[in-house]
A protein has these predicted regions:
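Short alpha-helical segments that sit at the start of domains
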Residues: 1-25
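Exposed, interaction-prone assembly regions rather than primary DNA-binding/catalytic cores
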Residues: 110-159
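Short amphipathic alpha-helical interaction segments
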Residues: 49-65
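Short, amphipathic alpha-helical interaction segments positioned at domain boundaries
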Residues: 89-112
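Short acidic, hydrophobic short linear motifs in intrinsically disordered regions
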Residues: 23-49
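Minor-groove-contacting beta-hairpin "wing" of winged helix-turn-helix DNA-binding domains
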Residues: 75-86
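A short, conserved structural fragment
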Residues: 63, 67-77
C-alpha cells in the first residue's frame, strides 16, 4: 500500500521531517528544506526572486506548523540552516527576539514621527505630532521596564 502525498508540499515536508526523527536540537539545512518543498533551483539571476519567495513561503509554513501542531520552534542559525530550539530554551529565545523586534519597531516609529518637517504642518497637525511624540516616549519608557522584567523572568534559574 502506498503512502499518501500531502499537498501543498510544505505539509508533506513536515510529515517527512517528523518521520525522519526531527526533534529538539535537530538541524535542517535550507537546501534540505528546498528539496522537501520541491522548490526548483533558480535557472538565472531573474529567477532568484521567485526561488527565494517560494522557499520563504514554504519555510514559514513549516515553522508555523511545527510550532502550533508539535510545539517545536524552528529558527534560523544564521549559517544557512535551521535548528529546533529545546523546550528549556524556547521561552528565553522567544523573549529575547521579541524584545529586540519591539525595540527596533519602536525606534522606527519614533524616528518617523520625530523627523517631520513641522514648519510645513498646520497648527492642528503640529499638535498631533507633538502629542504622538509624547505618547511614543511614554510608551517606550513603559516598554523598557516591562522588557527588562520579561528578560529577567525568561532567564531566571528555577530554585
Amino acid at each position: 500500500m502506498s503512502s499518501t502525498t500531502l499537498y501543498p508540499a510544505w505539509k508533506q515536508a513536515v510529515r517527512v521531517l517528523l518521520d525522519e526523527g526531527l526533534t529538539f536540537g535537530t538541524t535542517v539545512t535550507r537546501k534540505r528544506l528546498a528539496e522537501l518543498c520541491q522548490v526548483k533551483s533558480p535557472v538565472d539571476v531573474d529567477d532568484v526572486r521567485r526561488y527565494d519567495l517560494e522557499l520563504l513561503t514554504c519555510i514559514t509554513e513549516i515553522k508555523d506548523t511545527l510550532l502550533t501542531a508539535h510545539c517545536m520552534l524552528l529558527v534560523s542559525d544564521n549559517k544557512g540552516a535551521y535548528v529546533v530550539i529545546a523546550p528549556e530554551s524556547q521561552t528565553a529565545y522567544a523573549v529575547d527576539t521579541g524584545v529586540k523586534a519591539i525595540g527596533r519597531e519602536m525606534k522606527k516609529m519614533a524616528m518617523a514621527v520625530s523627523f517631520t518637517k513641522t514648519e510645513l504642518l498646520t497648527d492642528t497637525d503640529r499638535a498631533k505630532n507633538a502629542d504622538a511624540q509624547a505618547k511614543i516616549s511614554m510608551l517606550a519608557g513603559m516598554l523598557k521596564v516591562q522588557n527588562k522584567e520579561l528578560v529577567k523572568i525568561a532567564h531566571k534559574d528555577p530554585q
